[in-house]
């Protein structure tokens, strides 16, 4: 009986987190009401507050969950010993595929970090499992060595590994972060936007790697 109660409680907490994630990602912390989350989760507000004392606690839990999904496996790919060209293609495929399934995620993350700068460290920890101080040496070390070797061989223009990563991620994330503007400016409906993103799987590796050739 106790095991059944514990499982039911766990299911309820997960249902609340699922509802909170959906609502926070669409509306942001400022635009979200606890009553809306309770209704989406199918619980009353008293039970909601039993699991999460206040909106801030629930917002932090929802943000951490969203942060884990922002760069699925990207950090591991960048830090790996794989060939540089393959890393670029893999990162692009991972990001475009994931963001196509979660198109509101970049706008939510950007908005939360802008209004709650302290969540930047939370984002890094959730995505990488590292502190901001450990991130550079652990993630960028291999990339730095690969770039330096390519530059020395005359196969690549010099670029800081930090710029390499930021430029690559920006090319993937930007169309989703400002999707309404992109669609309005280019006259795209949702179907054409999806086709546009599908083409970027081929266009981005060629563009990014071509820009680094000497």
Task: Identify the residue ranges that each predicted region occupies.
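Helix-turn-helix
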Residues: 15, 23-57, 61
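Hydrophobic alpha-helical connector segments
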Residues: 75-108, 128, 133-136, 140, ...
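Amphipathic alpha-helical linker/stalk segments
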Residues: 2-4, 60-91, 124
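N-terminal intrinsically disordered/low-complexity leader segments
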Residues: 1-11, 18
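Generic hydrophobic, amphipathic alpha-helix propensity
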Residues: 12-21, 37, 62-66, 70, ...
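Amphipathic alpha-helical packing segments from all-alpha helical-bundle domains
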Residues: 71, 75, 118-152, 162-163, ...
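C-terminal peripheral helix-coil segments that are non-catalytic and often amphipathic
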Residues: 2, 94-97, 101, 137-157, ...
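Amphipathic alpha-helical segments used for helix-helix packing
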Residues: 87, 101-126, 179-187
């Amino acid at each position: 009986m106790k095991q059944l109660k514990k499982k039911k409680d766990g299911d309820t907490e997960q249902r609340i987190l699922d509802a909170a994630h959906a609502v926070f990602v669409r509306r942001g912390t400022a635009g979200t009401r606890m009553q809306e989350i309770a209704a989406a989760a199918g619980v009353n507000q008293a039970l909601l507050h039993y699991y999460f004392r206040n909106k801030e606690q629930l917002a932090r839990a929802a943000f951490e969950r969203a942060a884990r999904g922002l760069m699925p496996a990207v950090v591991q790919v960048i830090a790996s010993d794989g060939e540089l060209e393959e890393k670029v293609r893999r990162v692009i495929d991972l990001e475009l595929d994931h963001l196509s399934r979660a198109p509101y995620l970049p706008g939510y993350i950007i908005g939360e970090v802008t209004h709650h700068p302290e969540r930047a460290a939370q984002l890094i920890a959730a995505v990488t499992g590292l502190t901001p101080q450990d991130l550079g040496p652990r993630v960028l070390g291999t990339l730095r060595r690969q770039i330096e070797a390519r530059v020395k061989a005359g196969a690549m223009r010099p670029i800081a590994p930090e710029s390499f990563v930021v430029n690559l991620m920006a090319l993937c994330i930007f169309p989703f972060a400002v999707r309404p503007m992109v669609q309005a400016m280019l006259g795209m409906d949702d179907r054409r936007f999806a086709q546009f993103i599908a083409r970027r799987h081929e266009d981005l590796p060629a563009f990014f790697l071509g820009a680094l050739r000497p």
